Amino acid sequence: MREKRTGELTASVVANAVCAVLFNTSPLWRQYTQGVVLDDFIRVLWAVNLSLLVQMAGSMAMIFYRPPRFAAVAQALGTAAAVLSMIVFYVVFPLDFSAVGAAWVNSVIRVVLIAGMAGGGIGLLVQLGQLTVRWRTFSYTVR
C-alpha cells in the first residue's frame, strides 16, 4: 500500500467536508431537483454522514500519525463505512429519475451501487488480510 502524502490527506478532508455540507443542506436544494431527489433522502443521511466522518477522521489522524498498522485500520474502517453507506442508499434509494423521463437511470444507479458494494466488500476483505499480515509483521516486542 502506497503511503499517502499530507496534501492528499488534506484534500480528502476538505472534499469530504464539502460533501457533508452539500448532503446535509438537502432540504434547501431538493426543491430544485424536479422531484428526482425524494423526501427519503433524509433517511440515508446518517449513513452518509457516518461514512464521511470516518473518512475525515482517518485522514486527519493520518496527517499527524502514520504507522503502517494505524493506516491499515483507518482504511479498513473507511471502506466498511462506505460499504454501509452504499447498502443503506440501495435499500432506501431516495432518487426517482422517472420524474424527468429518465427512469432507466434508476436501474443504472442500482447496478453501479451493487458493483460498488461488491468491490467495497472485496476491498475490505483484502484490507483486513493486509492488516492481519501487518499485525504479525510489525508486532511490538516487550523489553
Residue ranges and their predicted role:
Residues 1-51:
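N-terminal signal-anchor transmembrane alpha-helix
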Residues 55-88:
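Loop-to-transmembrane helix junctions at the membrane interface
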Residues 33-41, 89-111, 125:
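Interfacial non-cytosolic loop connecting adjacent transmembrane helices
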Residues 22-26, 83-95:
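C-terminal TM-helix exit segments that contain a strictly Trp-centered aromatic cap at the helix terminus
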Residues 41-54, 107-117:
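Alpha-helical transmembrane segments of polytopic membrane proteins
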Residues 1-9, 36-44, 67-80, 104-107, ...:
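Membrane-interface segments at loop-to-transmembrane junctions
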Residues 124-143:
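Cytosolic juxtamembrane helix at the C-terminal end of the final transmembrane segment
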